[in-house]
Amino acid sequence: MVLRLSKAEWFTSKVSATGLYSVPYKRASQPLQQTLRQYFGGLVHDETPMVRRQAANNLAKFVKEMNTAVVIEEMIPLFQYLASDDQDSVRLLTVDILIAIAEEIPKEQQPSHGVLLTSLQSLFEDKSWRVRYMVADRYEKVPGIAYCATVALLVR
C-alpha cells in the first residue's frame, strides 16, 4: 500500500505515503527495506513542495528505524538535499532530521562526518529567519554536533 501511494499521480497520495514508511520498515525483508528507502528518496526529490515538506517532516521518524550504516550511506544525502531546498518551509524541517541522524550515529563517529557540522552551520546562517529560529529553538537537542559547532564558531 505504501509503495502504491508513493507511485500515485496526485500529491495527496504521496503526502499520505510519507508518514507510513516507518511502520512496515522494521518488519520488512532486506530487499523490501531497500525498495522502501528508494521510494522514500523519490518522494524527497519530488517536484511538488508539499510532498518534499511532508517527506522532510517524516524523515526523522524513518531514520530512527534504520541501522547506522544505512543512515550514513543513504539518509545523510537525502538530508543534505532537503537542507538545500529552495523552500524555507522544507529547510526548517531539516533541523529535526539532523537531530535524528545525530542520535543514530555514535558520538565517536560524528566528527568524522563533518557534513553534520557543516549542515548545522549552514542552517545557522540560513537566509530565512524561520530556519534560524528553528535551529535556535532545537539547539540543545542536537547531541555532540552542537558542541563541535560552538567550538568551531568560537575559533573562527
Where on the chain are the PLM-derived regions?
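N-terminal alpha-helical segment
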Residues: 17, 36, 55, 74-75, ...
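Short inter-helical turns and helix N-cap capping residues of alpha-solenoid HEAT/ARM repeat scaffolds
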Residues: 9-10, 47-48, 86-87, 127-128
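Short, compositionally biased segments
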Residues: 11-13, 138, 142-156
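HEAT/HEAT-like alpha-solenoid repeats
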Residues: 1-6, 30-44, 69-83, 108-124, ...
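Hydrophobic residues within the alpha-helices of tandem HEAT/HEAT-like
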Residues: 5-6, 20-27, 43-44, 58-66, ...
